[in-house]
Amino acid sequence: MNPEQFQMALAEKGIELSDDQMKQFHDYFKMLVEWNEKMNLTAITDEKEVYLKHFYDSISAAFYVDFTKFDTICDVGAGAGFPSLPIKICFPHLKVSIVDSLKKRMTFLDALAEKLGLTDVHFYHDRAETFGQNKAHREKYDLVTARAVARMSVLSELCMPLVKKGGSFLVMKAAQAEQELQTAEKAIKLFGGKVEEHFAFALPVEESERNIYVITKTKETPNKYPRKPGTPNKLPIE
């Protein structure tokens, strides 16, 4: 998917990108490739692959969820900024917080946000377990996203505490998502969530499976969650 195809594909979904926004994506791609030479940000560096598997894939959530209804977003373990920064480029009104445990990725994201002229974007170098117990952030976000490889039961413990009551947790998964959901149902309920919607689709060009789950926060997360750093991964609630 080249940049022109990317722009057309989004337009077909009702997301019209201006020349300025297209330049932001171009600069994002250039910086990603440049910085990737000195630090491991992504295994995907081919332009067409980046536009499809990073940019388009990140924005695909907006085909099913109305981002104009949200004000604040937190992206847990965003790595090189996915999915939150491509979403931010498309929906500039969003106030985005990104938390990641690797300092070098924070350095990249800071430089990237400055280059792209992104405002209302904040980066926090922290473990998700610690961040979720921080009163300044706990249950403060309209929407929390995760595009991480961790199991859904683990992601729920890391992300649900950050979602405000009535807000949503958006889980983006590839294949085997249904199986993961079954093992995560206990955790989702415990942390105050309810699975509201599931969208399954294929990524264009390569036709690979994608799944998006919208989990609504119906009640507050018990204070003891998330547990200490490392515990959710070692002893997931399933």
Swiss-Prot record:
The keyword Cytoplasm applies. GO terms for molecular function: rRNA (guanine-N7-)-methyltransferase activity. InterPro entries: rRNA_ssu_MeTfrase_G, SAM-dependent_MTases_sf. It comes from the Bacteria. Its main location: cytoplasm. The keyword Transmembrane does not apply. S-adenosyl-L-methionine binds at residues 77, 82, 128-129, 147. CDD domains: AdoMet_MTases. One of its GO terms (cellular component) is cytosol. Keywords: Cytoplasm, Methyltransferase, rRNA processing, S-adenosyl-L-methionine, Transferase. Belongs to the methyltransferase superfamily. RNA methyltransferase RsmG family. This is Ribosomal RNA small subunit methyltransferase G. It comes from Listeria innocua serovar 6a (strain ATCC BAA-680 / CLIP 11262).
